[in-house]
Amino acid sequence: TSVDLVLAMIYTETKGKTDDVMQSSESSTGVTNSITDQKESIRQGVRVLSDNLEAAVHHKVDPWTAVQAYNFGKTYIDYVADNGGVNTVELANAYSKDVVAPSLGNTSGKTYTYYQPVAMYYGGGKLYTNGGNIYYAKEVQLNLFLMRIFSRL
């Protein structure tokens, strides 16, 4: 369900440990952690996700592109539409390197290692500094899968 997707995103973002549980401040105010109320964070996060999902349908891309765009920004949806219509780690990596990181000052392609199991599995954990999280949609997928397993126990 969509509630499960939002819960998986909250777990991916903050594990529910901060007031801005969906890390949605930046989309609202342009400043990280400026939302200090969990309900407002969820309202804003769901608003962004809903807009992304509508844009994904309009551009005929897969829904995981909309989830990845939650991390990268809505223009990622256009990028995927122009490059095959399906979110992949490879596409996310190219977008991170060529669009996100340079727009935030990383013009040298500097990377760092992100020690997270999904990241290590898909790409050795490499992320571009200031480039967002190329593994975001995959992490949400894994968390959604685990939630479904544990709900059956």
Predicted regions and their residues:
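Short, functionally critical alpha-helical segments immediately adjacent to catalytic or ligand/cofactor-binding
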Residues: 1-17, 24, 45-46, 66-72, ...
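Glycine-rich phosphate-binding loop at the start of an alpha helix
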Residues: 3, 18, 35, 39
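Secondary-structure boundary/capping residues
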Residues: 18-19, 149
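Short, solvent-exposed loop/turn and secondary-structure capping segments
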Residues: 19-22, 80-82
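Short linear capping/connector segments at secondary-structure termini
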Residues: 22-30
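Non-catalytic cell-wall polysaccharide-engagement segments
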Residues: 32-43, 47, 51-153
